[in-house]
């Protein structure tokens, strides 16, 4: 509990789990930490980039955070790993590592940087992000507080900058990013992330098991029963895992695209996350599909808007991008954050709370542009 002396840690406790009861012996930290390292290709960089590394390299990265690889799927563009606590994606020019629970994600930064150096690449862009933790007092190492995370990240990337997106006393994201872009280039990456709380109990009952179930007929039944098969359809290569006694993860890849979903079903701390890099002019169809599966009491959606991406072009031309309140009449938008965190790169985050029965309608988001 020493971290509670840090005012930012105290603030981070507010709002994530609305009905937290300390009498619960087991409360799992669903909200993930996310680390992305993008490599600059220079003269002499291995033609396959980070894909030149075999699994031994990534196993060492995972060992550094005390997790392990459960399953893997590959295609020409992506190596996808389901981990004991979340996911790893490796592409030619980047690594994306997403971990839940009390995993000390920042401990693997030196090994990822070493992997970049080994193939004669250079670190061009780093981002570390997480939703405010549900149970921050249970975190370990550099994740005991935002101050410790900032200190650790600054030691690795001194020119990086920290941001908080959203109200500090409620649902918000902490982002630290480092940019060493030498010359402007086409910037068309896409990232849509959702965090959902208070999941539909008729759905969460499916994510309990008396044994761990890897991808197979039994997990196919779970996907069909819950509607996940509509989100991750047959066009995707998938691998999933039903945890024992509860919890579920799925990774899916299609060409250079990925989707990942992680579920904590316990009633007192039910949570699900969704992320994809799929390009779209408007994300409403994707978001609505995810909401149909989980029907959460509240959710946050965050979109990173690169200037040359499909969603970036739509946003800058004045079009809607699918996160606006008119798409979600069963929810009320409680706060919106818009931030140009580096020139030309914007982030848009909206917090939604389910409306009371009989009050369905359309509302404008409250909050401010930051």
From Swiss-Prot:
Keywords: Autocatalytic cleavage, Decarboxylase, Lyase, Polyamine biosynthesis, Pyruvate, S-adenosyl-L-methionine, Schiff base, Spermidine biosynthesis, Zymogen
GO CC aspect terms: catalytic complex; cytosol
Binding of substrate, residues: 28, 85, 266
PTM remark: Is synthesized initially as an inactive proenzyme. Formation of the active enzyme involves a self-maturation process in which the active site pyruvoyl group is generated from an internal serine residue via an autocatalytic post-translational modification. Two non-identical subunits are generated from the proenzyme in this reaction, and the pyruvate is formed at the N-terminus of the alpha chain, which is derived from the carboxyl end of the proenzyme.
EC identifiers of the protein: 4.1.1.50
Free-text disruption phenotype from the record: RNAi-mediated knockdown causes cell growth arrest followed by death. Putrescine levels are increased and the production of spermidine, glutathionyl-spermidine and trypanothione is severely reduced. In addition, expression levels of AdoMetDC prozyme and ornithine carboxylase (ODC) are increased.
Cofactor, free-text remark: Binds 1 pyruvoyl group covalently per subunit.
Cofactor(s) demanded: pyruvate
List of residues that carry Pyruvic acid (Ser): 86
Protein family per UniProt: Belongs to the eukaryotic AdoMetDC family.
Complex formation: Forms a heterodimer with catalytically inactive AdoMetDC prozyme; heterodimerization is required to activate AdoMetDC.
Protein name: S-adenosylmethionine decarboxylase proenzyme
């Amino acid at each position: 509990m020493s971290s509670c002396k840090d005012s930012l840690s105290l603030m981070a406790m507010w709002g994530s789990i609305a009905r937290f009861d300390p009498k619960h012996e087991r409360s799992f930290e669903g909200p993930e930490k996310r680390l992305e390292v993008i490599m600059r290709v220079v003269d002499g960089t291995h033609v396959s980039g980070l894909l030149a590394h075999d699994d031994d390299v990534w196993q060492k990265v995972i060992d550094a955070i005390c997790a392990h690889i459960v399953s893997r799927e590959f295609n020409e563009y992506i190596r996808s790993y389901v981990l004991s606590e979340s996911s790893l994606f490796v592409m030619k020019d980047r690594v994306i590592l997403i971990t839940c629970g009390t995993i000390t994600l920042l401990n693997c930064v030196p090994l990822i940087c070493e992997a970049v150096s080994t193939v004669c690449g250079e670190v061009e862009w780093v981002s570390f992000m997480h939703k405010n933790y549900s149970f921050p007092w249970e975190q370990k190492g550099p994740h005991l507080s935002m101050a410790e995370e900032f200190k650790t990240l600054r030691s690795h990337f001194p020119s990086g900058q920290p941001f908080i997106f959203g109200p500090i006393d409620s649902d918000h994201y902490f982002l630290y990013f480092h940019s060493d872009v030498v010359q402007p280039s086409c910037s068309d990456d896409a990232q849509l992330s959702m965090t959902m709380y208070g999941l539909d109990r008729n759905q969460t009952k499916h994510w309990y098991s008396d044994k761990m179930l890897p991808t197979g007929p039994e997990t196919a039944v779970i996907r069909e029963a819950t509607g996940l098969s509509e989100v991750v359809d047959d066009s995707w290569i998938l691998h999933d895992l039903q945890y024992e006694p509860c919890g579920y993860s799925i990774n899916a890849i299609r060409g250079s695209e990925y989707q990942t979903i992680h579920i904590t079903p316990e009633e007192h701390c039910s949570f699900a996350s969704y992320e994809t890099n799929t390009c779209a002019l408007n994300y409403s169809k994707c978001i609505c599909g995810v909401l149909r599966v989980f029907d959460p009491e509240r959710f946050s959606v965050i979109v990173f808007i690169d200037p040359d991406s499909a969603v970036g072009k739509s946003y800058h031309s004045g079009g809607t991008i699918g996160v606006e309140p008119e798409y979600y009449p069963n929810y009320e938008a409680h706060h919106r954050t818009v931030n140009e965190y580096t020139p030309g790169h914007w982030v848009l985050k909206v917090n939604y709370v389910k409306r009371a029965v009989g009050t369905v309608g359309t509302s404008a988001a409250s909050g401010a542009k930051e």
